[in-house]
Amino acid sequence: ADDKLKAPTYMETTSEYLEDFVIMVSPTSPAYTAAYDYAGDVRWYNTLNLAFDIKRARNGRLLMGTDRLVAPPYHTTGVYEMGMIGKVYREYRIPGGYHHDEWEMENGDILILTQYLPRGTVEDACVLVDRKTGKILKEWDHQDVLPVYPVGGSGSQDAHDWFHNNAVWYDKKTNSLTFSGRHQDIIINRDFETGKLNWIIGDPTGWPED
């Protein structure tokens, strides 16, 4: 077998729990992105240099970050819609590039995490992309609602990577978006329509009182 196709060193689950699903793993080492069943056996793999974030779309295809870099260390051109045998049906290219996460909306449009590279910051914005045309329909810039560096913070926070958004989640009931901000040690929730900041969860240490 190809030495880039890695077997898990440890896996604990059952066929009753996992059923016909697989666990997809996208490594940051020189290894293939792969899917494993309950026994740890490889059921699927991809030879492209993919890092983020594989999700099964409602049509059965896969959504994942592309393998084409626009800025180091891992910001790529956008998101692929790919079939299980590797055929790329669409590439959604984002002007600021893609990182970490995407979310398929009920109507098929896609939330994609991005940034505005010319201003010198990363991982602090999100866009809504039309599934059929690739056009950007809405944008949420976290600099509109949050104080920028130095606020709160982890040890790896700096002015360039002040927020470090790792994930996005849409809640239909409240019509809102939830984002994680690793470098400010917070989770925030924003109104989908207006972008208004609804709430912040996190340690208030290091934050201005207002």
Task: Walk through the language-model features, giving the residues of each.
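Histidine-/acidic-rich catalytic cores in large beta-rich domains
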Residues: 1-210
